[in-house]
């Protein structure tokens, strides 16, 4: 009995501990010779250096091919990752993978679904989507506190307007089904802007209480709204299509768009988005 009297308060204290989480989403641009001076072998060290400097607890990448995943694994030894290639659920095609600090977190379970009418079928696509798209997720436990939470990472179609709308509807359904009442983060390259129809589904409080970290942040470290630049430091088209959305459980402590560059080019054609959360 004395043991129980000591243990129960400790369990109660652990369950009330606050988790502080630094998350980042980054479309790193696939490895293709067509990019010339911006090819992956030339810029991979810059991408890894940016990530080392920002030190996110968890970050999601989009467009990563298997060789790029291997490069990041080698260049960022403090991280482990979960993800699958979208074409075969193995190593073929682009990943929407999640990297996490293995000294701070452990993965309880993970999964991937396809943004289609048959989300359990690898390689499937539907609606007016040009190519196969996925959402990968992990259920994390913070080792220090024992608190757990979900992170979802996705990349929407770049051409199909209906596909983007239907993908947002599907993700809402899947998150409710998978995460239940647990805290969660949804991030990625959504290929829609705040004025587009799918964005309105994010703030539909009657369905799920999710906030855009750009607007919810207590401290906004940038007023820039551009996340796609096509590698260009100057003269880029300005589009905000990369987001970090947080469930109602989360305080958004800060928001930033990382504009690190060499004076001519950014390390990728997208800029990484960073948010600090607590729950």
For the regions a language model picked out, list residue spans one by one.
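Bacterial Sec-dependent signal peptides at the C-terminal "C-region" and cleavage site
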Residues: 1-19
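Short, solvent-exposed loop/turn elements at domain surfaces
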Residues: 30-37, 108, 161, 220-224
């Amino acid at each position: 009995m004395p043991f129980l009297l000591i243990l129960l308060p400790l369990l109660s204290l652990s369950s009330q501990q606050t988790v502080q989480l630094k998350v980042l989403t980054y479309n790193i641009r696939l490895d293709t010779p067509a990019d010339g001076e911006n090819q992956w072998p030339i810029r991979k060290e810059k991408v890894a250096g940016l990530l080392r400097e920002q030190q996110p607890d968890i970050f999601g990448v989009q467009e990563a091919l298997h060789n790029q995943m291997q490069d990041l694994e080698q260049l960022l030894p403090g991280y482990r990752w979960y993800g699958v290639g979208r074409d075969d659920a193995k190593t073929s095609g682009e990943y929407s993978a999640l990297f996490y600090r293995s000294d701070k977190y452990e993965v309880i379970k993970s999964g991937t679904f396809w943004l289609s009418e048959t989300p359990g079928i690898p390689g499937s696509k539907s609606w007016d989507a040009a190519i196969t798209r996925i959402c990968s997720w992990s259920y994390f436990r913070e080792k220090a506190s024992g608190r757990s939470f979900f992170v979802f990472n996705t990349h929407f179609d770049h051409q199909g307007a209906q596909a983007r709308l239907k993908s947002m509807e599907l993700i809402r359904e899947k998150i409710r089904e998978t995460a239940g009442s647990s805290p969660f983060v949804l991030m990625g390259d959504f290929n829609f802007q705040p004025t587009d129809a799918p964005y309105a589904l994010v703030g539909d409080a009657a369905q799920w209480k999710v906030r855009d970290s750009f607007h919810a942040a207590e401290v906004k470290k940038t007023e820039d709204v551009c996340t796609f630049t096509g590698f260009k430091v100057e003269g880029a088209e300005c589009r905000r299509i990369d987001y970090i959305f947080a469930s109602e459980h989360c305080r958004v402590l800060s928001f930033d768009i990382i504009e690190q560059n060499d004076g001519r080019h950014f390390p990728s054609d997208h800029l990484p988005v960073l948010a600090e959360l607590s729950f």
